C-alpha cells in the first residue's frame, strides 16, 4: 500500500506537538459529529469513529468532553463539510477535506495554498476517482495470520492485512471500521496504533527530489489551514 501508517501518524503528531493544532482540529470534528447526531458514541457511529481516531493521537479527555458538551448545549455554531480536489507539482493528486463556517474564506485559503506551491485546484471529481474510501486499523502484539484468523472467526471482511515493522495494518471497507475493531477487541486487543477513515490512492507516484520538496511544502500549507481536517494524496513520501 506504500504507506507506513505509524510513521505518518507520528510525523503529524510531532509537527503539531507545540501548537496543539491537531487537538483543535479534533475538537471541531468531535463537535460536528456530536451535533449532527446523538452526543453518545454508542448510538452515533460518526462520533465513535472520531473518538477512536482521537485516542490514537492521545487527544486529552478535556478537549473531547468540551466538544461534546458544546454540542449538547445547543451551540448555534454550524460547520459545512466541504471537499476540494486538486493537483500538486508534476500532476500529483490531492484531496482536501474541510469543516468550515465560512465557505468563501476556506475556498480562497485552499486555492492559495495550491497556487503558491506549484499546484492548482481542480473541479469536483477530477481526482477522487483515483482514490478509495478505506478504513485503516493498526495494532501491535499480533501477527497478520493471527489477525486474519480473528477476523475470519468473527465473519468480518478485510481488503488486506499487512505487517509493517512491529505493527499489523488492516485495510477494510469504511463500513467495516467498527466491526474490525470490535472483533479485535473481543480477541484481547486493548489499544490501536492507527484508526483512520481515509481516502487511499489506488496508485502511488514518486516525485523527483525538487518536486517532492515543493509538494511537501504545499501539503504543509494545506494542513496548517484552520479549516482543513484531512489532506489525502497519491505521493509516496518514503515515510
From Swiss-Prot:
It comes from the Bacteria. GO terms for biological process: regulation of DNA-templated transcription. The keyword DNA-binding applies. One of its GO terms (molecular function) is DNA binding. Pfam families: TACO1_YebC_N, Transcrip_reg. InterPro entries: Integrase-like_N, TACO1_YebC-like_2nd/3rd_dom, TACO1_YebC_N, Transcrip_reg_TACO1-like, Transcrip_reg_TACO1-like_dom3, Transcrip_reg_TACO1_YeeN, YebC-like. It is found in: Cytoplasm. Keywords: Cytoplasm, DNA-binding, Transcription, Transcription regulation. NCBIfam families: PRK00110.1 (NF001030), PRK12378.1 (NF009044), YebC/PmpR family DNA-binding transcriptional regulator (TIGR01033). Belongs to the TACO1 family. YeeN subfamily. This is Probable transcriptional regulatory protein BT9727_0453. It comes from Bacillus thuringiensis subsp. konkukian (strain 97-27).
